[in-house]
Amino acid sequence: MTSPTSVAGPLRVANAPCSWGALEFDLEGEPIGFAQVLDEIRDTGYSGTELGDWGFMPTAPAALRFELQSRDLQLLGAFVPVAFAEEGNHAEGEARALKTARLMRDATGTAPLIILADDNGKLPERTRNAGRIRPEHGLSESQWTVYGAGVNRIADAVRRETGLRTVFHHHCAGFVETPDEIAKFLESTDPAKVGLCFDTGHY
């Protein structure tokens, strides 16, 4: 029998700034700086990190590269939320994803991921019913078409310009939360362009 490590190399574990409260949601308390976050990621034995929200870490490639390399950390990806159900949000989402992808490409010698997600927590009905979503809380067929087209568009643009791969992170309080919604998302998107960042905590 083939062991997992013989195929993909030894398993390594990473963390992300959101574990320190540095994320897109408004939280109480004084945020801590990126240097402390990276120091503690390193000191607790993790081998990599996500980028965090734009501007949390340095946005100059050389500066970001220095901060990561000086701690022997690998940059694995960046979370980019977009309200995909509205077609008018796709162009702005593409611009943000490309800006983030360019930074990661230029700062690393690896192939980090763009991690797309819905703009979670912004719709009161989805937020109030998170964890107990019913079919009537979801998207219509026409909205799924718009949603999938937006994800494909951004993933295609990122791959074309930077060579980076895109995955999608399903999450509570967004339109891709339940097993049925995840299945519909996969049906509505192109697997050659976008993969799934499977989150066991939100399935």
Describe each PLM feature range.
Residues 1-110, 145-146, 152-153, 191-195:
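N-terminal pre-domain/capping segments
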Residues 3, 74, 86-196:
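Active-site acidic/histidine proton-transfer and metal-coordination neighborhood
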Residues 19-21, 53-55, 81-84, 118-122, ...:
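Active-site-proximal loop/turn and secondary-structure-junction residues that shape catalytic pockets
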